[in-house]
Amino acid sequence: MDESGRQRPASHVAADISPQGAHRRSFKAWLASYIHSLSRRASGRPSGPSPRDGAVSGARPGSRRRSSFRERLRAGLSRWRVSRSSRRRSSPEAPGPAAKLRRPPLRRSETAMTSPPSPPSHILSLARIHKLCIPVFAVNPALRYTTLEIPGARSFGGSGGYGEVQLIREHKLAVKTIREKEWFAVELVATLLVGECALRGGRTHDIRGFITPLGFSLQQRQIVFPAYDMDLGKYIGQLASLRATTPSVATALHHCFTDLARAVVFLNTRCGISHLDIKCANVLVMLRSDAVSLRPAVLADFSLVTLNSNSTISRGQFCLQEPDLESPRGFGMPAALTTANFHTLVGHGYNQPPELSVKYLNNERAEFNNRPLKHDVGLAVDLYALGQTLLELLVSVYVAPSLGVPVTRVPGYQYFNNQLSPDFAVALLAYRCVLHPALFVNSAETNTHGLAYDVPEGIRRHLRNPKIRRAFTEQCINYQRTHKAVLSSVSLPPELRPLLVLVSRLCHANPAARHSLS
């Protein structure tokens, strides 16, 4: 009769005994029992002498000398050890089905990414509300992987202050690896937040201006994104070399940057998140079939993302369910995402609005240090930076070729130790007072909140230090001598007017005019 498939019921008596078939008995229990038996012997109760006791005590056969308590204890301990070892040798088989592990295995199951992942339907979901004001978000467990084992050649995609990017062109994937563990936690949370906002914005407002993650690895400190053709900086160089300035290119550019402006307003206002690092390298583009016109672009690189005053999740927490763990792993909102940092806001100064440069020169930083970022400040910074990226394209592709002179958007890349210097801030403000009036549109649609461009008198009036005011005045005079005559001869095709109007509104000297885009 075959009984290989049978099992004992849980109530069987064998479930209460050891796998060796005998009742488990600890040494402590045995010692207590043995001492109790010795006390009974000492009380005068008859007990026959043991040959083993005599052998251990060293007494001669037939001797009536009574062994000491220590000798009897040693003999009993020896018998207990012998009996225990004999039971182990007689039952070498493994524990049966009744024996179960009381803890999870030490080695967790591996989840390697072996094929290109599909875009997620969601990234975060509200799990519960803790203490009435702390939302706890569950991270989509399908995004997590341990190792990246997708076949295909890797190529260098770029590097920055926090990590580098590798491209897998065969599968249209980009893998970003963060160097530092602390910065990986910050960027991962920021990427998950912006990614969820991007998915919700696409469903409810048809806003698709942000890159969404496809997966992440805590062990490798990696985040996987869809790969794009190139960034905006490379596209500007390619467009300038091809000299492909057809009306269709200008129309596609206008649609692209209008959508990006809507996305920036949505992120800052509805989501309470400010990007704070919009530049050509962080705008990723896809080309149409003609290889020159743009498809809708996206913003990437959320290393400097900060929650602004419109955010309701600054105290939020996150939980991630991992394999073989009963309870999910929890982690809170990184402090770097919840407070403003003046150094982060100013950066190198290339794309920052004039009001920030003036505050930098006046040393007015108290309102930004260790305080929540104001929504209107974050929105004004992001919109101005987006306008500067568009202005970079217009100057490099249209203005400089039409003049035959290498005119640039900024006076030069002058900074020390990756920080903005006062000399460069003064030069940048003065240079914009000459460049912007030559390119910005001066009309009713751009002058609702005053002139769209900065004038020297307005900047000079806000500078407190007399020495800095004199330096600014001298720089304005110098740039007017070297650039004003050249820029006065700029002649751009009429199809660029919508782009120039958009630049004038995005880079308006009055922050309130930028807010009106929302």
Swiss-Prot record:
Top EC class of this enzyme: transferase
UniProt feature, compositional bias: Low complexity: 44-61
Active site: 277
Transmembrane region(s): none
GO CC annotations, alphabetized: host cell nucleus; viral tegument
Keyword Oxidoreductase in annotation: no
Cited function: Multifunctional serine/threonine kinase that plays a role in several processes including egress of virus particles from the nucleus, modulation of the actin cytoskeleton and regulation of viral and cellular gene expression. Regulates the nuclear localization of viral envelopment factors UL34 and UL31, by phosphorylating the US3 kinase, indicating a role in nuclear egress. Disrupts host nuclear lamins, including LMNA and LMNB1. Phosphorylates the viral Fc receptor composed of glycoproteins E (gE) and I (gI).
Protein's name according to its UniProt entry: Serine/threonine-protein kinase UL13
Organism (species): Human herpesvirus 2 (strain HG52)
